[in-house]
């Protein structure tokens, strides 16, 4: 029952405060640890495919295990001092593991700049939440990028952390965030990370396999509750959910594309390199800035479904 309260409290904290810039965030420290471990391992292992595979595997083992042990020890120590202190620490970290409000704030900034007609500012705003190159994006491209990242991060930034914190509290949720951060930094199929980032990418695929599919189903339900096209969401999800190199990334994107009646994904540039990617959804109408707000609403509704059912099940199980 304490875990359910910690999750509920963390959700409320994220909904109210988001991720204040002045407050240190665990993902920042995870990123620094990844960079330092990568530098350390690359300097000491052979610069061969086998050496890079080994180095990436060592990093993919050390960071999640270290995160789980450290956060678990802190939560245990706090609970030993006083149960309410343990609950407070869990709530705080659960809130930091969620990214719903931050995602909505950033995507809304993109929407605001598009409505002003300021394409350079919109490109800059969307560059804060996507990994692709944004310098040459059209207004339609900026809108697509924002909608796609809301859909994908509904799983990575909200539903998946919720699932893991319901299973194992803040320590397991932050361990998931460590895995997700590794994939964000290392999981590229370019010359630098083709071998070194493989273990991180595969681990992220495993960690997101169930959450991404659950998130897609919740998104389809949210489409019905927000007066979007739930039937279209179901149809496009069934058809296009595998239209991505990752087995998970197209799950919520396809549901979102179908719910909105637009086409997402397609080719993009990353770090100056062209990546051909299949499209997701049918272009029943042109995408428009308001689709960013529609995606935000569906993400919020889906996350509340996940919270309500997850806490109810967790509370029932004890």
Predicted regions and their residues:
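Hydrophobic alpha-helical transmembrane segments
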Residues: 1-175, 179, 187-318
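Glycine-rich phosphate/dinucleotide-binding loop and adjoining beta-alpha-beta core of small-molecule
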Residues: 184
């Amino acid at each position: 029952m304490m875990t359910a309260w910690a999750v509920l409290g963390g959700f409320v904290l994220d909904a109210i405060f988001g991720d204040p810039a002045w407050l240190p965030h665990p993902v920042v420290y995870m990123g620094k640890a990844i960079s330092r471990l990568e530098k350390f391992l690359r300097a000491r292992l052979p610069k061969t495919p086998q050496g890079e595979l080994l180095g990436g595997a060592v990093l993919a083992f050390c960071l999640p295990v270290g995160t789980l042990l450290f956060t678990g020890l802190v939560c245990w120590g706090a609970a030993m001092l006083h149960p309410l202190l343990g609950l407070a620490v869990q709530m705080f970290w659960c809130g930091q593991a969620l990214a719903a409000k931050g995602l909505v704030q950033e995507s809304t900034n993109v929407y605001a700049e598009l409505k002003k007609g300021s394409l350079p500012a919109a490109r800059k705003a969307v560059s804060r939440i996507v990994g692709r190159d944004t310098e040459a994006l059209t207004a339609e491209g900026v809108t697509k990028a924002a909608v796609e990242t809301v859909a994908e991060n509904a799983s990575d930034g909200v539903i998946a952390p919720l699932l893991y914190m319901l299973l194992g509290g803040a320590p397991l949720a932050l361990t998931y965030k460590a895995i997700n951060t590794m994939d964000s930094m290392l999981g590229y199929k370019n010359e630098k990370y083709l071998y070194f980032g493989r273990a991180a990418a595969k681990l992220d695929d495993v960690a997101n396999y169930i959450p991404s599919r659950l998130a897609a189903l919740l998104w389809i339900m949210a489409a019905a509750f927000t007066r979007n096209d739930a039937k279209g969401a179901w149809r496009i999800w069934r058809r296009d959910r595998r239209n991505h190199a990752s087995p998970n990334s197209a799950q919520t994107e396809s549901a979102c594309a179908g719910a909105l009646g637009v086409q997402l994904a397609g080719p993009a540039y990353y770090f100056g390199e062209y990546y051909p990617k299949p499209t997701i959804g049918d272009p029943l109408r042109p995408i428009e800035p308001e689709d960013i707000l529609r995606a935000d609403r569906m993400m919020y509704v889906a996350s509340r479904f996940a919270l309500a059912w997850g806490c109810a099940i967790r509370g029932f199980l004890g």
